[in-house]
Curated annotation (Swiss-Prot):
The record marks D173 as: Role in the control of polyamine-mediated channel gating and in the blocking by intracellular magnesium. One of its GO terms (molecular function) is G-protein activated inward rectifier potassium channel activity. Inward rectifier potassium channels are characterized by a greater tendency to allow potassium to flow into the cell rather than out of it. Their voltage dependence is regulated by the concentration of extracellular potassium; as external potassium is raised, the voltage range of the channel opening shifts to more positive voltages. The inward rectification is mainly due to the blockage of outward current by internal magnesium. This potassium channel is controlled by G proteins. This receptor plays a crucial role in regulating the heartbeat. The lineage of its organism: Eukaryota, Metazoa, Chordata, Craniata, Vertebrata. Residues 130-141, 142-148 dip into the membrane without crossing it. The keyword Nucleotide-binding does not apply. Pfam families: IRK, IRK_C. Glycans are attached at N119. Keywords: Glycoprotein, Ion channel, Ion transport, Membrane, Phosphoprotein, Potassium, Potassium transport, Transmembrane, Transmembrane helix, Transport, Voltage-gated channel. The chain crosses the membrane at residues 81-105, 158-179. This is G protein-activated inward rectifier potassium channel 1. Residues 1-80, 180-501 are cytoplasmic. Belongs to the inward rectifier-type potassium channel (TC 1.A.2.1) family. KCNJ3 subfamily.
Amino acid sequence: MSALRRKFGDDYQVVTTSSSGSGLQPQGPGQGPQQQLVPKKKRQRFVDKNGRCNVQHGNLGSETSRYLSDLFTTLVDLKWRWNLFIFILTYTVAWLFMASMWWVIAYTRGDLNKAHVGNYTPCVANVYNFPSAFLFFIETEATIGYGYRYITDKCPEGIILFLFQSILGSIVDAFLIGCMFIKMSQPKKRAETLMFSEHAVISMRDGKLTLMFRVGNLRNSHMVSAQIRCKLLKSRQTPEGEFLPLDQLELDVGFSTGADQLFLVSPLTICHVIDAKSPFYDLSQRSMQSEQFEIVVILEGIVETTGMTCQARTSYTEDEVLWGHRFFPVISLEEGFFKVDYSQFHATFEVPTPPYSVKEQEEMLLMSSPLIAPAITNSKERHNSVECLDGLDDISTKLPSKLQKITGREDFPKKLLRMSSTTSEKAYSLGDLPMKLQRISSVPGNSEEKLVSKTTKMLSDPMSQSVADLPPKLQKMAGGATRMEGNLPAKLRKMNSDRFT
């Protein structure tokens, strides 16, 4: 301990476990107890890494009778040891019951005592006791037919029992053998060859913060119509005060683009883009340390060899999501084929990733760009903006018809239109800025001083400006404007002169 202090100096602190076990208490040399660090409580998994749902049903009461109404599914869902026990027990009871029935018939007819009489015809030949009756039933049920024991035509009750035995044996065989076949052919073992990465990662992809994990198929047989879904399990409290311990939210992994439909021949990286619609819109690297959530991944598809639907599941808790990591590439191009290296399937490496959430990144982008017009946040502002646009349209429609025709002509100087539109756009952009920025923007630079002074002089005394001082191109434009003004009514000419003065 002293060697560590000499190496690291006074900054070294000893972290000891408190006696109560409720947290960690760091202490430094010559210092009293510091603030107690309470460790984050680990979330109980809803779905294990192997796909098993960690749920137990209790206090069913009378509802347990529903299991008997679907007896076949109940037997299939049982564990193998119980299936084998029921299989052996059912056949043993059925065999003993039918053997007892044949023995009862032989006993009631007196065949057990008269079987050795030469001229006596028993119901079943060569049945003297219960073991011989049991062997006769087994030979008949298994269709072995040794020929030593057989039923005669002098026993109608034996014929009826023989028919009942055949029907009952077929039912038992169909039920138990079918149950065992379905249990053996279940695609649960096929899910063992579908792999999920041990961790999920968050990093930038195509300029967007993205949650990613990897899936793979170890077999050469394909999964037909493979589809993947993701659920976010997180506890929350509603505004009404209701607590939801397992609130399920859908994570978009490409529903609109079809990216959720997988061609699972080689390992694929599943992506969830974190945007304003994502539940992780507010998630940052720092806030993830205090969050508690679970991402459940469900991969479904049809097994190519059997045609049965297979489902593989796994989950990722907040501790299994790595911020600023990316998966190591596993596919390489060899001579004539692609090779997949599954030894690097779970491997990740660090990449530069902003530690901020998408919401924080958007806010910082808005703060760093002051020229961006403020967003319309409520319906009142949106309504006022629409009214302003309608007012501009009304002003243009209230002009005299002659002016409307002149401005609507194709040969109207486009340069003037561009100049006017540029001026108006600049005025609108300056009007959207704060007052301090407007005053700064209104100060002309060295390169624009002459232009601004000349423009001010022209605007202050437009009537005294000589047309001859203008460039030739502007002289023609000014002459055209003078002719257009001469064609205006007297009232409009007076309005124009009042505006200039």
